[in-house]
Structure formats: structure tokens, C-alpha cells
Curated annotation (Swiss-Prot):
Tissue expr: Expressed in shoots, leaves, stems, inflorescences, flowers and green siliques.
Protein name: Thiocyanate methyltransferase 1
EC number(s) on file: 2.1.1.n4
Leader sequence residues: none
Sites bearing Phosphoserine, chain numbering: 86
């Protein structure tokens, strides 16, 4: 059973999940030529684990996430959106790719949790919802945007959160590779854009629930909006 679980953790649809370096080399040309929509249209999505992020499953199972309204920017196939959704937590999955959201709706449209989540086609940098969020979860979104867009990302996170809201960042990939996406990150990469605008790091720790190919390359950061 342990071997089966490890194989599951390392795979996506039967394919081994590649390293950040391999993904960066593979994706650069595709994104440059056709953007993220082309990636989803042609099913070139090596970052998609095909299931909810193990850390999110753990946080849900241990009741370690804020309740209320939650947002997952760059939600892709929607796995984490559905995992987080509950009667006490309504989750919005945001993406600019119609194909990604079509896949998410196809996979989860008939889920028994369907009334507790929605998928929305919007750009997180310009979207202004009528209600703000108690929680935002970012994983493989921050590392996918161009590095010069990171201050704008931080501003959007701040503006979309309620006062005293929480931002959870699963920081990845913490490597020394060149280029992207995904672009390399570290804790200071997040601190530099979040702290000056009014976020405080509550905790930063290794992710013990990372899949084998990402062990040692991820950290969990929990941030509170303080002003």
C-alpha cells in the first residue's frame, strides 16, 4: 500500500510529475506562443497533480483553515477548490483559462459539494468581487507569473482579503534553477512583496506533506492581513 501511495503521489494520470527545471524548459515555449489557455487546450499541464494538494487535505481534515469565504487564484482543474469546500466554507476557484474551468466543471460539476463552490473566469489582477474573502490559498500561481508582476500579485491578495483575513502560500519551487515558469522562489521572495503592504508572517515551515518529487522544495507560509 505504501508503494502504491508513493506511486500515486509521484504521478499525474500515470505520468511522473517532472521537476521544476523540466517543467520550465517544457512550458516556456508553449506559454510564450499560446499562453496558459493553450496549455490547458492541449493538456500540457505537468503542474497538475490530478487530485487535491495533500497539504490542503491535511489542513481540512484537522480543521486548520479559516471558515467563511475562500479563494483559490489560478485554480486550474479545481481539485483544491473542491477539497476546501464545505457548508461552512464557500470556495471560489478563479482562472483565466476557459479550458481549465471547463475541465474543472466537467470533473466536479456533479459533486455533492457543488453548492459550496464555484468556478469563475476572471483575471485576479483586475477582478473586483462584491464580497471579500476570509482566506486565499496560493500554490503554483505565484511561481507561474512573471517576477515583475509579484508586487501586483501582493496588492491583489491584500485587496481581496477581508480585514484580518489569511493568505496561505505554499511556496514552490524553492530551488536554484534558472528561468520559468515555474520561476524559483524562496521565503524572502514573498516577504519582499507582502510585508511592506500590510501582511505579517504568522508561521513559515517546511511542508511535511509534499509529494516525493517536491520534498525539500516547498514551505508553507501563513500570513495575516494586519492593516
Amino acid at each position: 500500500m505504501a508503494e502504491e501511495q508513493q506511486n500515486s503521489d509521484q504521478s499525474n494520470g500515470g505520468n511522473v510529475i517532472p521537476t521544476p527545471e523540466e517543467v520550465a524548459t517544457f512550458l516556456h515555449k508553449t506559454v510564450e506562443e499560446g499562453g496558459w489557455e493553450k496549455c490547458w487546450e492541449e493538456e500540457i499541464t505537468p503542474w497538475d497533480q490530478g487530485r487535491a494538494t495533500p497539504l490542503i487535505v491535511h489542513l481540512v481534515d484537522t480543521s486548520s483553515l479559516p471558515l467563511g469565504r475562500a479563494l483559490v487564484p489560478g485554480c486550474g482543474g479545481g481539485h483544491d477548490v473542491v477539497a476546501m469546500a464545505s457548508p461552512e466554507r464557500f470556495v471560489v476557484g478563479l482562472d483565466i483559462s476557459e479550458s481549465a474551468l471547463a475541465k474543472a466543471n466537467e470533473t466536479y460539476g456533479s459533486s455533492p459539494k457543488a453548492e459550496y463552490f464555484s468556478f469563475v473566469k476572471e483575471d485576479v489582477f483586475t477582478w473586483r468581487p462584491t464580497e471579500l474573502f476570509d482566506l486565499i490559498f496560493d500554490y503554483v500561481f505565484f511561481c507561474a507569473i512573471e517576477p515583475e508582476m509579484r508586487p501586483a500579485w501582493a496588492k491583489s491578495m491584500y485587496e481581496l482579503l477581508k480585514p484580518d483575513g489569511e493568505l496561505i502560500t505554499l511556496m514552490y519551487p524553492i530551488t536554484d534553477h534558472v528561468g520559468g515558469p515555474p520561476y524559483k522562489v524562496d521565503v524572502s521572495t514573498f516577504e519582499e512583496v507582502l510585508v511592506p503592504i500590510g501582511f505579517k508572517a504568522v508561521s513559515v515551515e517546511e511542508n511535511p506533506h509534499a509529494i516525493p518529487t517536491r520534498k525539500g522544495k516547498e514551505k508553507l507560509g501563513r500570513w495575516k492581513k494586519i492593516n
